[in-house]
Amino acid sequence: MSRPAVIGILTVSDRASRGDYADEGGPAIRAYLAEVLASPWEANERIVPDDIDAIAAAIRDLAAAGCCLVVTTGGTGPAPRDVTPEATERVCTKLLPGFGERMRQVSLAYVPTAILSRQTAGVCGLSLVVNLPGRPKSIRECLDAVFPAIPYCVDLIHTGVDHPPRLETRPERLVAFRPKNA
């Protein structure tokens, strides 16, 4: 049996990192993953302040720790301290703009301010990094929109790697897309 996939969950929030209030984004991501993933997985969770260096370091650390997927929550708006996309772009060798485009497209159906969101995605080492908004409802909407592509993207990132992680979804909840020959 293969080892569980390790998924990084990174909450970006000044207030949550100080303990001023409970993190809601990280638990929302964890609950979503538990709902849609059929394959074994474990979480590596972190909370950091809205600081570009802290965010970049956490993404690099999670990638180095073997996370095949790093999902961030928070810090994607236009406010001065919203720097998660910049930190992501700093550490990723390849950007995958389609993820952000799709999330904004879907979110605009719910709220006109989704146009202010700057989510992005990219590849850091052998990790797919995906930025999500901070609100649990928006996290679910965005993950429903992009998660069908995530397992195959993880497969592609791990091309040629011995014993790559394999993310399998619960088809009754979410059908992941993989080409027939994959």
Residue ranges of predicted features:
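Non-catalytic beta/alpha edge segments that cap or flank active sites
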Residues: M1-A182
